[in-house]
Every structure is written in C-alpha cells, then in structure tokens.
C-alpha cells in the first residue's frame, strides 16, 4: 500500500481520495498520536483547526472536528485562515497540535489535510507514519465528560494580525500596495494587515466563492496583479497563493520579483541590521546562481537543500539559521514563524521599500538573475541519472564549459518517469544550447526499453 502522506500532508480530489470518512479517520488517528502527551496527564488535549475557503473545506473541517472531539480533543475552530496563521496559533494558544485543510495553489476541486505539532512545527516523517499506522487500529471512544468540545476561535484572525504587525521594522505610510489574495485564505486578513500597517491598498482576488480559488489570480497567475499595479500607479504588488504560505511581488513597472530576489533583499537587510544568523541564507538547489553570487559578494553564504520547504526548514532548525526559502516564494523567517508565511514576507518586503525610500525595482537589482532553462525528459530510467557514465561525462563537460558563469542540475522526478535538466548560463543562447544537448544525451542514454 502506498504512503498516504505526501510531501505536504494528505492531498487529493475532495470526495475522490479525500472523503469525509478519510478525514475523520485521520483526525481520530492524529488524536491518539499527537494528543497522547496531555491525555496521560488527565487533561483534554487541544487542537486548532483552520481551512482555506474551498467549498469542500466545510465538510472536511466538520469531519476533522468530529473525529477529534469524539476522540477526546477540544477543538478550536479558527474558520478560514492562512496556513501560517494556523501554525502560529498552535504555538500562541499552547495547543497540542493543529490541522490545516487546504490544497494550497491547487485548483478548487482538490483539498488537503496537514498537521502541525506542538509549537506549530511541521510533522517529521516518522510521526506521519505513526498516524497512518494508527488508522488501522480502533479509535479511542471516550464518554461523558471526557468527550472533546468544539468552540469557535473568535479572535484567531486578530491574534495573527497583531503578531505580524509586531514584526514590522518600519510602517508603510505613504506606500500604495496592490494585494492579490488568490480568492483564498488571505482574502480577509491580508487587506486588514496592510491597512493597519499604514499602506494605501488596492485589493484584487479577494472574493472567494468556494470555487474560484487560484483561478486566474494569485502567485501562479501574476498577469492580473501586474496590470493592476501599473493601472493604479502602485509602488508594488503582493501575490499570495490559496493558503497564503508563499509570496511573489511585482514592482511599480509590472516586473515580477521572485522568491530568490525577495530573499536577496531581505537577507541583505537582516545582515545590515546585524540580525542574519551566522550570515547564512538557506535555499534549495533550484535557486538561481545569481542569488549565490550576489550574497557571496555581500559576505553571506548559502546552505543548499533539496527542493521543498520542509527540507529548508530542517536545515534551518539543524543549523539554527533564521532565514530561508524557495524561488517559488516560500520564505521562512524563523524569528517570527515556523513555516513559510506569505503575509509576513510581503509585509517585510514592503517595509524595506518604505524604510530605504528605494523602489522595489531598485532593491531587486541587488542580484542579477542568470538565464535559466529547464527541459523535462520523459519516459527514461530516472534511477540511472546519477550513475550512467555517458550522462555523467556530458554533465562534467558542460559544467567545465560554464565554469563559474553557470551551472548544470539533473533532478529525477519524485513522482514521474522523467528527469529534469536545468542549465543556467551567462546568456540564454548558451543555456539553451547546453540544455538541449544534455536533454538529448539523457534521452538516448536512459531510454526505457519498450515492453515486449
């Protein structure tokens, strides 16, 4: 049987893989695994439950709350909130764990369930495995006064906004900011946050109807935000995804500022203020080489991880670092959050525009993005990508040609029979030439023999 938990919780088509029955079973199992510590002390454990505004989130949330309360867990129902808000509230409430119901940037028919441990931390693999194992056992069924209660967490959003405002290094008075909330979980609190921080705001993508989340808006569809920033003469635009754990930005001319550029701006700002732990940024292997070059010149080193914010988080925890993230816009401020937080990231970025008096476009020039090209080579034996002599020789030859002006990365897909070939170079023609050559070598050398 395949593992139920993926890289970011349990995710799938609502009422397909992810049924109310499965949601309740997951909740009942999590109640045993995550609520065990306090239940042994005689007190009922507590859990925070939140969701994004997908229509299916209502029945999944109800099933989760039923599964938890019937297992002796007191539920604090926070309603529609960003994923990072749920993580923060677990810590703020001193709850035993939290549950977030969201499929992030996926389309509306999908949904997901992810858990946060005490303190708002993501679960390690072994705890997820323990929850799966518990699902095969009978749930606990307390009675009488031991049954959990469900209550509305009425000030959840206010607590989160007050927390974020407390991180501001400079107010946003005088700035005009366009917010794209992806018709998602940030639709209520992001406009409130930026308004309270002093910005003049224009809001798009903040009319969720349960079916329009991420539909033509948000961090995966930047066109609407780019147009709005230019049309309104705004200083910058901030784009969230459906659950608001990531942030991309738009400068006043309508140019995209991606996660690498955002991390460069914020890393330099933290270093200048003496707050960047060990002068280290944690980023994945997919971050642009231009980021590493710019930060190296500024006396900041990069610790590289595999792709995925969970690996960034692990490296940050292990090394005690306080800033990390991904090109996609997951940025983690360990001093203020336990996970990627798109509202916190956007707030800190806007604060740098206000604090320095420089435009976002000017701030983004701290790094020069190298042209980057990626080709997916399908129907190949991805397991041999790191051992085939012909492939390794071609990669070594390309790397030698690029020297310090570029790099080559081969990444076998975790879910498909393909290998991703990525090349960065000083110019796009060079990147294209080398990438196409390597893709051809991979296709030839790793070809899967046709079935007889």
Curated annotation (Swiss-Prot):
PTM comment: Activated by phosphorylation.
Reactions this protein catalyses:
alpha-D-glucosamine 1-phosphate = D-glucosamine 6-phosphate
Q: Which GO terms describe its cellular component?
A: cytosol
State the Gene Ontology BP annotations: carbohydrate metabolic process; peptidoglycan biosynthetic process; UDP-N-acetylglucosamine biosynthetic process
List the Gene Ontology MF annotations in alphabetical order.
Answer: magnesium ion binding; phosphoglucosamine mutase activity; phosphomannomutase activity
Q: Keywords, A to Z?
A: Isomerase, Magnesium, Metal-binding, Phosphoprotein
Q: Which InterPro entries match?
A: A-D-PHexomutase_a/b/a-I, A-D-PHexomutase_a/b/a-I/II/III, A-D-PHexomutase_a/b/a-II, A-D-PHexomutase_a/b/a-III, A-D-PHexomutase_C, A-D-PHexomutase_C_sf, A-D-PHexomutase_CS, Alpha-D-phosphohexomutase_SF
Is Secreted given among the entry's keywords?
no
What's the Enzyme Commission number for this chain? 5.4.2.10
Q: Which PROSITE patterns match?
A: PGM_PMM
Which of the residues bear the PTM Phosphoserine? 104
PANTHER family in alphabetical order: PHOSPHOGLUCOMUTASE (ALPHA-D-GLUCOSE-1,6-BISPHOSPHATE-DEPENDENT) (PTHR42946:SF1), PHOSPHOHEXOSE MUTASE (PTHR42946)
Assigned protein family? Belongs to the phosphohexose mutase family.
What is the annotated role of this protein in its UniProt record? Catalyzes the conversion of glucosamine-6-phosphate to glucosamine-1-phosphate.
What name does UniProt use for this protein? Phosphoglucosamine mutase
What is the organism of origin for this protein? Answer: Arthrobacter sp. (strain FB24)
